[in-house]
Amino acid sequence: KEEKMSNLNEIAPDFNLKNTEKNDIALSSFKGKTVVLAFYPGAFTGVCDTEMCSLRDSMNSFNDLNATVLGISVDSPWANAEFAKKYEINFNLLSDYNRDVSKAYDMIFNGLGGLEGYECSNRGVIIIDGQGLIQYRWVAENPGVEPNYSEIIEKVKSLS
């Protein structure tokens, strides 16, 4: 199996993705902060809704720890904007519509909801420290599995 780009203690691959306002958001612009990348398969799908709302409800903790949360999916900026509005998501949702970032972080899932050939982001969490190094990586065995939110906050605390 080939080495993937996103191993622990390696430099996180930089990226530039559009947020819900179609503004460019670069990972490198958060240098010095802890960054939580929350990959999710799709807006308006049950577990994704739960995951993003759980992260939303934890934002005060993340803010207190000088951490930024970035949600990443292959959805369009417009779908992400509606998703953010419906659930009052208070962090950037980024559109990886060409799937480059999901591939760079080895977060591609094939066949969501039985759609053969449909590639989306798998559910996963990457935590990057202020130096831009990957310090935590969790990937769902299948998109129906949620991350351990308290473990994520504990890891962010340990880096702050």
Give a label for each model feature.
Residues 4-160:
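Chalcogenol-based redox active-site neighborhoods
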